[in-house]
Every structure is written in C-alpha cells, then in structure tokens.
Amino acid sequence: MKLFYFSLLFTLFFGLISANRGPKVTDTVYFDLQQGDEFLGRVTIGLFGKTVPKTAENFRALATGEKGFGYEGSIFHRVIPNFMIQGGDITKGDGTGGKSIYGSRFPDENFKLSHQRPGLLSMANAGPDSNGSQFFITTVKTPWLDGHHVVFGEVLSGYDIVKKISKAETDNRDKPLEDVKIIKSGQLSQENVEDDGTDEL
C-alpha cells in the first residue's frame, strides 16, 4: 500500500512539473522596436513549434524575411490598453492586409493553447481560417479569445517594452499617434537565447 501511495505521489509531482513547463519553445525570434524617433529596445519571442508547427514556421519565416517579405519595417497598427498590441500587417499597415508564407491566408491550425496570461503571441484574424501575417501580444488574460485565435508563442524578454507600447497615445482607431515600428527582425540561435523575460510577466 505504501508503494502505491509513493507511486501516486511521484506521478502527481512530476505531472505538475511537466504542466508548469508549458509548451516547448523550438525557435526564438526578435524585434528591434522604435516609437517615433525613440529606440525602445529588443523583444524576443519564443515559438511553440511542436504544438503549432505551421503557425510557428509562418511567423519565424516572416521574422527572418527569408521568403522575400516579412515583418521588418512594419508597424504595430492597433494598441488597446489592458488587452493587447497588434501588428504584422505587412502589406497595408492598417489592419486590412497581410499575407502568409503559404499564400494569402491559411487555416486555424489548432486551439490547444489558451490565452491564459499576459505575454502570449496569438494570430489575429478576420474570422475562422483567415490567418495571414497579423498577430497580437496579450497584456492581460484573454480567455474569451480561446477557440477563435491560435496561440503559438510567448514573449521571452522585453515584456516591459510591450507594456510601454500598450500605453501609447492612440487615435480613434486605436492606432498609435507615433508609429511603433519593427526596425529590425530576425532569428536567434537557441544556444544564445537568454530566457529572462518570463519573470516580468
């Protein structure tokens, strides 16, 4: 009987550890951001390529620009305090455009991950199966988005920059009065990634 209880406790303990780890980060990308004339710094983002491989690969390739187009030079066109910051419209810059590496749009991959905390990366869309290049980063828990938007990454460092952007002064369309621009983007090797941002969330 003692052996049974020991085995049960062992299973529960390591189950909790595994659950706390969350989805595996397979790739890390970065955005160097500028607001108006002010350089804000670098945000690094981990992508959950095991859980949502197609969605993660789309974002990774757009961050590197290896397909001939991508996020570099684009802006965060929509900012709502206590909700999220949205960017990735690489064709029009106003929330009506964007395109993926698979064509104009691609389907929702899955909804395995929930919008359970700030600092999560999720696909913006115009309805079911309409993913392109637009994305948003949460600044609060947003459970009402579960089942509608695909979560596929998290901020690893630079969340303080995300919070600063979320407080930017905006017009009546939620667009920052000063452009918040991705002046450089790319991919980091996993060996050189310092996961120091999760403590900020």
Swiss-Prot record:
Chain ranges of the PPIase cyclophilin-type domain: 30-187
Signal peptide residue numbers: 1-19
Entry protein name: Peptidyl-prolyl cis-trans isomerase B
Reaction it catalyzes: [protein]-peptidylproline (omega=180) = [protein]-peptidylproline (omega=0)
Activity control note: Inhibited by cyclosporin A (CsA).
Keyword Isomerase among UniProt keywords: yes
Residue pairs linked by disulfide bridges in the UniProt entry: none
Cell compartment(s), UniProt: Endoplasmic reticulum lumen
Gene Ontology BP terms: protein folding; protein folding in endoplasmic reticulum
Acidic residues bias locations: 192-201
Species name: Schizosaccharomyces pombe (strain 972 / ATCC 24843) (Fission yeast)
Family statement drawn from the similarity comment of this UniProt entry: Belongs to the cyclophilin-type PPIase family. PPIase B subfamily.
Pfam families: Pro_isomerase (PF00160)
UniProt-listed Enzyme Commission number(s): 5.2.1.8
Domain of life from the UniProt record: Eukaryota
Gene name of the record: cyp4
Phylogenetic placement of the source organism: Eukaryota, Fungi, Dikarya, Ascomycota, Taphrinomycotina
GO molecular function list: cyclosporin A binding; peptidyl-prolyl cis-trans isomerase activity
Function: PPIases accelerate the folding of proteins. It catalyzes the cis-trans isomerization of proline imidic peptide bonds in oligopeptides.
Motif Prevents secretion from ER: positions: 198-201
Region (Disordered): 174-201
GO cellular component: cytoplasm; endoplasmic reticulum; endoplasmic reticulum lumen; Golgi apparatus
Glycosylation sites: N131
Keyword line: Endoplasmic reticulum, Glycoprotein, Isomerase, Rotamase, Signal
